[in-house]
Amino acid sequence: MINEIQGFDIKFNEKTSRIINIDISDDIIGKLIFPFNKFDLTALEYKPFTRFTVAKSLDDLSNNKLSKFLNDIIKDRNTGCFIIKPKNITPKINDSFLVKLSTAVAHLIGKPNHDAMAGKYYARFHVKHVDKSDSYLRKAYTNMDLHTDGTYVKEKTDWLLMSKIEEKNVEGGETAMLHLDDWEHCERLYNDPVAKENFVWGSPRSKNIDYKVEHPVFSSDDKGRAQISYIDQFPEPKNMEQGIFLQ
């Protein structure tokens, strides 16, 4: 699934054909400066319509091809993932610009869920050398094991967009992605009867969610293929069978 869109360098990721790399040219970035500068971050946070305005600014520069391409990628089970970024980082690309770019990309796909932890339509945080938070999310030296988003909230989570805005004094720490169809244990776990039982899912205090939800670890899509919703920190097993299954 490789399209040609003027101003965007599109190719398969060097490590897997399941990920599409999209590099935004300097020309496109330059043309985004003016429309992005119409709104500061406070405006984007307070006035939801502005988020779609910056999204349209980006899509217009692709002759409205980018929005369709991004949606085609995430709806295709064979891919489902893209990495989009400026081809070159220039002084004009600061943290505010990158938040606006992420906002634009997200709103070309759909309307993001409200983030209860941040109290906004997006969450932004630092990963530092020392961390005293109550979840693995911000801990620099602790591996986050198998992890999908949306396990402990009532809203349906179809896709996730993550941005790395700045990195200093760091070695390693690359994001690890695993396609469910490439996971060697998926079929065995998916076919385990416990996988379809309702589990209770809670969250630490920092998430600002005052309720718990119930749902299975595994479900099926409209073609009977495995889907998973799981974060190892949040399930609360009801019995020994559920606890052992989670191992």
Each predicted region: which residue ranges?
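Generic hydrophobic alpha-helical segments
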Residues: 69-70, 175
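Short, charged/polar micro-motifs that form catalytic or ligand-binding hotspots
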Residues: 88-95, 148, 152
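N-terminal, charged low-complexity regulatory/assembly segments
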Residues: 48-54, 72-92, 101
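A gly/proline- and charged-residue-enriched helix-loop-helix capping module
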Residues: 103-137
